[in-house]
Each structure stands twice: as structure tokens, then as C-alpha cells.
From Swiss-Prot:
CDD domains: Dip2. It comes from Danio rerio (Zebrafish). InterPro entries: AMP-bd_C, AMP-bd_C_sf, AMP-dep_synth/lig_dom, ANL_N_sf, Dip2-like_dom, DMAP1-bd. The keyword Acyltransferase does not apply. Residues 176-187 have a biased composition (Low complexity). It is found in: Cell projection, Dendrite; Cell projection, Axon; Perikaryon. SMART domains: DMAP_binding. Gene3D superfamilies: 3.30.300.30, N-terminal domain of ligase-like (3.40.50.12780). Belongs to the DIP2 family. This is Disco-interacting protein 2 homolog B-A. Keywords: Cell projection, Neurogenesis.
Amino acid sequence: MADRGVDLAALPKEVREQLAELELELSEGDITQKGYEKKRAKLLAPFVPQTQNVDVSILSTDSTSSPITIPIAAPRQHRAHRSGGTRDDRYRSDIHTEAVQAALARHKEEKMALPMPTKRRSAFVQSPAENCTPPDTSSASEDEGSLRRRQAAISAMLAQNLQSPEYWINRSVQGSSTSSSASSTLSHGDGKTHNHNNHSQGQTSALADVLAHTRIDTNSSSGSVPPDVTSTAPQDRNSRVDLPANIAVKGISRGQSRSSMMDTAGGVPAHSRVSTKIQQLLNTLKRPKRPPLSEFFLDDSEEIVEVPQPDPNTPRPEGRQIIPVKGEPLGVVSNWPPALQAALARWGATQAKSPALTALDITGKPLYTLTYGKLWSRSLKLAYTLLNKLGTKNEPVLKPGDRVALVYPNSDPGMFWVAFYGCLLAEVIPVPIEVPLSRKDAGSQQIGFLLGSCGVGLALTSEVCLKGLPKTPNGEIMQFKGWPRLKWVVTDTKYLTKPSKDWQPHIPTANTDTAYIEYKASKEGTVMGVAVSKISMLTHCQALTQACNYCEGETLVNVLDFKKDSGLWHGVLTSVMNRIHTISVPYAVMKACPLSWVQRVHVHKARVALVKCRDLHWAMMAHRDQKDTNLSSLRMLIVADGANPWSVSSCDAFLNVFQSHGLKPEMICPCASSPEAMTVAIRRPGAPGTPLPARAILSMAGLSHGVIRVNTEDKNSALTVQDVGHVMPGALMCIVKPDGPPMLCKTDEIGEIVLNSRAGGTMYYGLPGVTKNTFEVIPVNSGGTPIGDVPFTRTGLLGFVGPGSLVFVVGKIEGLLSVSGRRHNADDLVATALAVEPVKTVYRGRIAVFSVTVFYDERVVIVAEQRPDANEEDSFQWMSRVLQAIDSIHQVGLYCLALVPANTLPKTPLGGIHVSETKHHFLEGSLHPCNILMCPHTCVTNLPKPRQKQPVGVGPASIMVGNLVAGKRIAQASGRDLGLIDDQEQSRKHQFLSEALQWRAQTDPDHVLYMLLNAKGVAVSTATCSQLHKRAEKITAALLERGGINTGDNVVLLYPPGIDLIASFYGCLYAGCIPVTVRPPHPQNLSATLPTVRMIIDVSKAACILTTQTLMKTLRSKEAAASVNVKTWPNIIDTDDLPRKRPASIYKPPTAEMLAYLDFSVSTTGMLTGVKMSHSAVNALCRSIKLQCELYSSRQIAICMDPYCGLGFVLWCLSSVYSGHQSILIPPMELETSLPLWLSTLSQYKIRDTFCSYSVMELCTKGLGTQTEALKARNVNLSCVRSCVVIAEERPRLALTQSFSKLFKDLGLSPRAVSTAFGSRVNLAICLQGTAGPDPSTVYVDMKSLRHDRVRLVERGAPQSLPLMESGTMLPGVRVIIVNPETKGPLGDSHLGEIWVNSPHNASGYYTIYGEESLQADHFNTRLSFGDTETLWARTGYLGFVKRTELLDASGDRHDALFVVGSLDETLELRGLRYHPIDIETSVSRAHRSIAESAVFTWTNLLVVVVELSGSEQEALDLVPLVTNVVLKEHHLIVGVVVIVDPGVIPINSRGEKQRMHLRDSFLADQLDPIYVAYNM
């Protein structure tokens, strides 16, 4: 250090004081280590011997690292002191530190390899020092800041290159974290695994990089970027590019699709970086937990889980019942005043020159002294002004008994004294509060609650303070958050009026009227006003006078806040009663000169000093063997927070240093107090030389069970407590159980101290309900009978009565954390955390411990401020060791340990941490941690036992018979019968769509079938019947001529959404080919989208590709060659300029069972499936839709969705040709440039029926939600819309459809218009809300029963209920039945099972290469095992149920509604229960406003939650605990890994469905570039 060679003792006093102040700033975290060294060097520079030719500012503390040797002459004490320079010894106990080290040593043997969280590299570089507000006294210069930034960048670089987190975790995987691989299993034999290295030199976060590194082998169609047949849109929420994964082709792999993917982890080799971490996490989780499994309880009734029953071996209290303890009688002294104001009047008249108060300036020098005469005269003026000069004579603003707020800074005691006594004299009730510093102070809203509950309308303040209050731009005082409107009155002397001669204040004898109100914050942060009556105030002063033996004319040094607690009781009230001279040392002076109070004691020969442990600690730190310090005048050093169990170490350490300066051990007097009961107990000063009272050394394990056991076995978990003396004079004290009825404790039991005394608070002002429970407690004995009728007041202190009636306090109710039936004190946990060395990670004074209720128990959370210079690895090491230490010493698991950037925790007015506000920030996700460690697996031990599936002894037949006997009908439903509906339309004669088009071209050539709109809403192309027919013929000719195509060949159609696609489809039918529509690759993102195209072409064995010129160029471009082998494309035919040729003949299939087209789609589980659609199925489907939606030539419909697969393709390409209606086509990508396009089209063309996808609906809801007024102004009117159907293959998204309906209700949209369709791979259209059926109904099911594969219907609003909407009306010709997927037996009404469908438009099978029909048979042609065993059904793979409703359908029968719950393939099986990802995701998305989207999947039984963050990156870590909490609370699952990513990372297919398996593969292959990955322990 710079002071080597400097004799500190010889330095001038001012320099020594400045050095002490610096030390203090460093210890409090107000200045960085660098800033400290720089400022210190500057101070010492003039005193460094000149021979040392060294720049003092950059000398290293560690002399070994510096080549320069410096003569070391610094005094020894200083060096020793430096090591503790950053310590806050309030929580310091050498014994405790030793204990923690021992506990950690025990853990070392079983080295715990916790996986370190992964931060995005960019996030690593941002040192928390940069993104936090500078500490309040920091003045680091700019060059230092830039140096710091540079160093942060360098260290981050080093962290990456030398010791990445992985290096620390597992050195055996060195080098492997940079390579990752992905493989794809293709059904046609190309199953080789391709391994390439992904170089990590420039790991930037840009997507471009991720894409540039995708490895697609030249001869393989496996892409690291997962194909989706469907999406062309750029990276945007609506319909996004599908990102990496391995697609398995559905066909032969169908049967093993899910299990095989789970086993092989999606083809990701085990040495991927992510996999290693997850493996580690699993290993960590395999370690035995507490409690053992036998203590888990069963969740049989499925009711709410209960906390486990306590262990029979827990220690129980064994002593006799406690007897109330009486304080000494309160003596009556003849000259005690009848009221406190009378004392002031007496001294003001008889001792006017006697000093009452001395205030200090910022340097600690006396600023002014207020005499008793001045105090009396000014208080009198103020009282007169308040009562007579604020309003008019007839309408005064204030009347006696009104409440007024006192707003004075801590540095101005004089103004406060005058205001307080002025109010007492005027008989208005003062309510002292803190000075508000900003509109959003920590706890400001609660102060507003206090002012409101006390009915305060007026605030007194000083001129200086008023000027400093935050103002609005026009100069008015700001309206503080939650505050009532206040009138502000300035009380400086120049504004006060001298009372008229005849005016005298009314000073009655002290009675039970309220004298003043003191504020108190509860554990939850609620601020209430404790009302103190005039008689209580006076009695309390008398009791303190007797206990402390105050004498007239003594001097008292008060370091405490004079607005409340002991600072007010001793320093403002009792001192005036006894004509004491008070020297008030403000907080600001203490920060600047921590020794100032000691110097004041010395200078003024003070007899009493009033301090807190913090002041002892600061003074001790700043002390440098000053010659001019003598404390022998003190007869009492009152330690106001002596009730803090850790105060004993501060007292001992202070005595250690100052005993040589005249401090006598018997003068240290700890006391215990609470806002409600005021002073509870205080140690009286002992006679000189008397031995100090003995300490209690208690077992922490005993304390956690609420019993007193002297610690014998393990010194590591002991708590040493000092007494707080005897109970106050005139008081009666009991100890009662802290929860439940106030039963008296036993002698060896810890309980809450309750006090009966005339000297306590009387009520919470304005809150009678809460008052009763606190101020009117009547203790009962073990039999439950009251011990008397005197009411006691709860103190909020936990303790016991020791030998000799000494009171011991071991904690406070508000710091109590009750976890699994055991009690832990927050302060004890803080002490343990801080005893974990090295504490170079966090600031000692800035740590908050609280509990949050998650899953029916309290969970412990620790939040600390991280030093800006702490690195990731040190922080993580420290955090891991804190977990171990707390586990060893307190036997309690930590739920969450979070580090936040320096100076960001909310502060109390005097610099402490505002714990309730911190907890509030934690729970609302606004704490912004820079490091977090969650351990739910360790501490959540009350989960219900995993469900064991019992073998069902009853067969399907018995179940069915049972249902029938019970009067339950079999769960089946059907649409209208196709055969019975007479369809006179001419097209009925045509079995094939190709014939229907020819017939339409002949009979109605100019009828417009299709109109395609662009972003401006202009029709860019139209197609009449004859135009479409002619264009199809041209394409047929080209196919036969150029393509060399044979009948039955597959042809890929690669077109953007439009009319070309439709013409090419019919061109293929005319040529006898099988069309396969494929979504074209996205030109800006070929590497992600082209492999899918390639895969479909390969899997379908396409003979040629029909496409546009632009797309043909793209397929053959250099960019494409980077992703796929462009030399092996099949024949590509561009259809832009075709010659006018007609084919010789048009093909007519010999039977309607022949294939019409193939429908390929990527499922949400990443499976590519192609299904075969025959001509008869196409015909039946078009007919069914025509009848359901009443489509005929004069109708117009609008379609805004992708036309590549499923029902979307049928509506876009087939339906109009069959039914003759006009379809207005709106490509969804046009909405990106013009959001209102779809809605304005509906309005402009007065469309009655429209079809869209969820992506489109979501885009409109999010993008146009705020623009309804603008749309109205443009005359957009949706009242014409009769049905708006969302085409989907999933459970209806009720929240989205409802918000869409609500948002656009203002534009005339009928709330009944919006409905959903449901289709699957085996049947593209099962339900579609038509014109005839009843409106879709909604039911509420219990989520817990769904997990058990049961349906329990509940009322709307029931807890854990899930709303499900019917998926539209069954199409004509469709029958569904609900079947048990395992037994294949039919189920009863309202039972959950797989939906099976029978319909003439079922697909005829999966398109496979090897023709393995056995697998398909199971899905497309399967029979029930009992009941109707003849009918052939297709299995949809979706779970759902049928419920008969009260509504009537078109035929007049009761309507059977089908409710889809979700895809079987997608469900997650966890803890023996079945979960639907969407349910967990819905909960997650509600957890925080910055969660844009989420997706969940499992990996080796761990639940992984991926969350898209829409806010700033500093919010990333806020999400981790919130996501963990919500999933635990609502789904009873522990999240294993939380991954925070950028918006748009979760891949979505064209139907707007999340592709969770792609996401999973990308995550495991380390391709997501996450912002943060948290591994929950």
C-alpha cells in the first residue's frame, strides 16, 4: 500500500480522520477498492518519503507481484486492521467464522461440483460496475472508469480463453465445449452422423454467426438447422423461421418416434457443453437430500399438499410453565412534572440559559446550541401559529387532536425539537416521518398508507428541507407515490407569530389522549402508526429516568435517529424531563467522521451515550490510538440494538479497543425495545469492578425448534447471547408462544416477549382490527384459561428469561423464517453467509435475508450486493460455499441466493437495507441480479410422491359395462350424415377435382374463383374458371414435354402463396402426377429453411420441381450451395413463361381410391410427416366443408394463412374449385408490411366468412390492439363477419381468441364470430364451426385431475382450473369416439382419452418409402378392442373428451361437444403424471411482463424452460426465480434448467405452433446463444 514507510500516528489529525472516513466508505461499499486506493494514495502522497521514486497510486497490495521492494515501516496494527477493512463487525464473531470454516472443510471431502450458470459472452464483458448507479459517495474519475472498463473487458477475455466456467467444472472436457454436433436419422438409410467443428474464436451473439456455422454435409440432407415445410417469414414472432434441430421422418420411425429421441438425446453427442452441465446437475441432484423419502407424504386425495409432520426426535420443552416477571416498582418522585409539556414550561422559565440541545455540522463541530429558554419560546410561538394563524378565526385549519406530519432531516434536530414540542403544546398529534427524497423512494407508498390511516393532511417542515423536496416542473411539491394530498407549513422562526399576551397553552395533567404517533414497519413492509398516549409518554420517561438513574443537568450524546425509538425516548423526551443537555450526532456526521461521537463524549465529559452496534463498529474501525480520547466520564453506554444476538461481538470488540481509554466494562448497557411496547428491558450500570453477567451459549438446532439447550455437542452451531438486563420499572413481562393462542411458554422454551405496562404504545392509530391482536393480548396457561384480565402488548421480540430474571433476546418475529416447522433467525443466516471467506465478493453491510412462500412452505432467499471487482467464478464459488455453510450450520436449504450490482438494493433512510422492499422487488422481478443460484431440488421436500401407475385389474369391456350401468353414455359424437343431405349441385357428378375444374371452365368460364391481394390491398392477379383451366393445361404440357414425367410420379410445387400454386396443382392432376406442396426457402435465411425443402424432395422421391424463375435461381445459387448439394436437385421447371400448348389428353384416374396429392408437414415434436390423400377423400372433404359453411357460387370468403398443408391448403387450393365460391387470398407475409390488410379486406369486401391461422390472429392482436381508433377512422367495420375460423391442429388458444374478439369488438366484430377448427395428420378437418350448429361451449377442468388422465369439471374461477373451448362443430360425415390409448376400449362421456375418427375424408396412410404398412395400419385402420369392433378408425394422436351439452344441434338433438386437450406425442411424463407443455408455458408467460414467449421440454427427467426475454438484458436473471416459483406453485414441478434467450429464438411452424423438439436439439447442441442459462440445484 501507499502508506508503507509512512508513520500513520504522526499524520495530522484531519488526514487521519479522512483516512478513517475512507476506510468506512470502503467497508460500507460506498467506494470501490480502486477508488479507495487512489484516494488514499492522494492523501498520503505528501507524507511518503521522497527517496521512494514510485508512483504510489499503482502499488500492488501483494508485494510478491511487484518487483519493487519498499521499506515496510507501517505500524503493525494498521496492517492487521486492513485485513478487516471491508468487514462489518455487527455480524462478526470469530467463533462463528471458525465454525463456518470447519463446516466447509467437512464439505470439501465430498467436493460438490455445481454446474456454473452460463452467461452469454457479451453479458460476461458487462461488468456489473458499468451498469449500476455509482455508489453515493463514489467519485471515481473518468480515466479510472475507462481503465476499469478496459480491465473488465480484458478479464472477460481471459475468462473465456483461460478459464471458462467449464474449465472449472470439469477439466476432463477441455476443448470439447467448442465442438458440438448434430445428426439426423433419415428413414432412407442415410443415418450417418456428421461431425464438424464449430470454431469458437469469434463467438458473437449474432444470429448470422450461428447460421454461418451450421454444418450441413454436402451429400446429406441432415441440417443442423431444422427444416420446416412451412415458414417463409423472416425472424419475427408471427411465423418465424424454424431453427436448428434434427427432423426424423415420420413413417417407419412413427412407433419409436418419442422414445428413441429421448434415448439418443436427439442425436447430440454427450460431450456437448450443455450436456456436460446437465449431467453434472443430475449428479448433484442424485446426492441424498434431507429429509429421507419416508418423510414425503402422499397426495392421495389430490387436495392441497401439507407440510410434513415434525420428526418425533425433535427436542421439546421440558421445563415448568413460566411465571410472569415483575419489574421493580416505579417510584414516585415529588418533583416529577404532571405532564411532559409542564417540564418544558418549568425549565423554560427557571433554567432559560441551560443548554438543551447541541447540533453538529457535517465536520462534527458544534453548529448551534438551543437553550431551554429558546426551546420553550419557539415551541410556544409554533403552537400559537398552528392553532391561530393557519386558517381564519371561524375556520381554523388545525384543531387539537388533529394529526400533522413532521418532515425534518436527520441533520436538523433543533427544528424537529421545536416542531415536536410545539405540537404537544398545541395539543395536535405529531407524526414524525422520513424526508422523501424522490417520487419512488423505497417504502414511500407505505409511508403514504401511514399518513392515510392517521388522517394526516398537513406537514410541518423547515425552509431548507422544503427547498430540497422533489418538485414538479412548475415548482409545486411532487405528489409522492401513495401519499394523500398535504398542505406544507414552514416552521422557521421568522415565519412564526409571537403569541398575544393573553394566550397561554393548555397543559392538562397527562391523560389517555394520544400525544404522538411513531411509525413502525411490519415484516411485510406495511407502515403503521403506534399511538402513544400522554400518560404513557410521561410514564415511559419516568421509568427510563429510574432505570438509567438520569440526573438533572447531565450531558447525553445521542447518535440515534431522534424521530423514533430510543433516539426519541431518551434523546428528546426523557432528556427534557430531566433538563439534560443532549448532543445530537447526525448520521451524515457519522459517515464523514465515525469517531465524532467518541470525541463529543470526551470533549463534553458526557455521562451517557446512546448508540447502536454500527456506531461501536465504525468508531472502532476509525480509531488510531488517538491520545485525546477519554471515555471515563461515561456512566452508561446504552446499546439500543443490544437485542440483536450478534451485538455481543460488537460490544466486546469495542470494549477491547477503548478499555485503555477509560471505558469500564460495567458501563455497557444493552437494551431491548419495540415500537409497540417501547423500552422492554435495559441492563443497569453495574457497580465498579462487579463481574459482567454470564452469557448464554445456545444450540442453534435447539433454537430452530424453539427450545433452549446449552450447546454441548457441536461448537460450530452455537449462538452466544448477552442479556439485556432486567424488565423495566413498573412493568410485568411474560413469554408466550409466537403463533397460535398466546399460551405461556415453559422455562426452557423460546417465545415472544409480551409486556404489560403503563409506559407502552396504546394502539395502531386508525387500525382497530390489527390493534386488538397486538395491544390486547391476554396470556393463557396450558389449560387454555386466561392468567388474569390485564392486557399485554406483543413486543415482536423472541427470547426467554434467564437466571436472576435477566432477559435474553435471540431474535425478532419480523426476522423469523419458519421453514418446515423450524424457525431460523435472518440475522443468524446473514452472519453465517458473511463468515464464508473470502468476502471479496460482497459488501458486508448490504445483505438481505427473507423468506418467500412457495408451494405451501417458506423458502429462504438471500440477496447481497456484489462488489464491482468480483469476478464470475469467485462469486459462484462464494455462493456455492454459502449454500454448504448454511446447510451445515442451520440444517436448512437455501432456495435462492442472488447477487445484485453494487448500490442497487433499496435503502432505509439511514442507509440500512430495506428488506421488505427487497423482497417485493424479488417477487415482482425488478431486482436485476447479476448472479443467481436457485436450489429448489434441495429445499423443496414437500412434493407429493410421484404417481405410481397401478395396473388396472379391469378390462375395457368391464369399464364400458360399468359406464353403461352407471348411466354414462359412451363418449362419441358425429356430424350430420353426408348421405342424407341432398346436394343438387352439378359438381356432385364429378368424382375428381380435375373434372370439376373442366366442367366449371365450360359452364361458367368467366366466373372469378380466386383473387390475390398485395400489401396495399390491390388485387394483383385473379383467376376465372377458364383462366385457371388454361393455365393448368400449359403446366401439364410443360410437365409432359420437359419433365419426362410418368403417371403417378411425385412433383414438388415450390411457390409463394398465390394463384401459380393453385394452377400448378391442377396442372399435376391433369398430367396424372401427384403434387407435393412445399413452402419455398426464405432467401434471407437459406441455411435454416433450405434443408427442409431438400428433405421433403428426397423423402417424397420427387421426379421434378415446379417453381418460379426467382426461386429456381435461389435453388442453384452459391448461398444455397453452402447449405445443400445443389448439383443433385431433380429436374427444375420454371412456370413463369410457358408456351401456349395444350396437352394431347387430360388424365382421368381409373378409381377414386388413387392418390390425389401428398400433404407434408413438420409436427411440433420435429417429425416430418407426409400423408396420402386419395381423390375420394378430397372429394368428401370438399363436400363436407361446402355443406358445413354453406358455400356456393355467389359467396365470397377471405383466407389469410399459409397454403402448404392441412386444412389451409384445402381451403386455398381445392375448395373454390369444388364449390364455386370466390376466394380472396391474402398471403400472411403481406401483413408484415401492412398489418391492417386482412381486417380492412374483410370490411371492404363485406366478407361473411374468413379463415386465418393463429400466427395471423396473434399478429393482429399484438400489432393492432392499440390502433382500433385509427382503424375506425379509416371506416374499417367488421360487423359483416359472421364466422372467423382459426385453422389449427391443437387445443384452441382461448386467451388469444378472446382477446382478439374483445379488441375488435369496437370495430363491430360479433363476439360469437370467432371460433376454431381442428384437424390432425390422419384427418385434416374433424371440426369446423359452420353456420348451423350451436356456438362453441367452454368448460373448466381441474388441472390436477388432467395430470392423472382424468377430467373433473369445475366452476369458472376455481383454483387450478383450466378453461377449454370446444373445437368447433363436427363436419358432416365425421364420427369421433374417445378411446383409452392403452386398452383400446371406448370411454364414457367426459372421460379423457385419445380421439379416434371415422370419416370418408380420412387420409389413407403415411407416405413411406419402404411400404411398411403395419405401422400405418395402427394409425389409419384400427378397431376397438370391445363394443363396435367392426368400424375402422384412425387414431389422431390427440387427447380429448366428449361432453353432451344442454344445447341443441341442427337436428334438434342434444349437442355433443368435442374438447381437444393436446397432442399425446407432445405430453411430458414427469413424476408419473402427464403434463401438456402449453399449460406450463401459460403459467411461465404470466410470471413476468418481459416474458414474450416460452417453451418447455424435458431432458433426462429434467424440466427445461426456455424463455424469450422482451425487456433489457439486465432483467434476464429476474426471470429465473419467478419461472421456478410459478411452475412449482401451479404444476408441482421443479424446473431443472432455465434458459433465457432473445425474442424469436423459439422456432415456430407456419401454423404458429412451437417446435419444441427443434428447440431441445438446438439447446443440447449449444446453438441457441442464450443470454443466460441457470441450472437449478
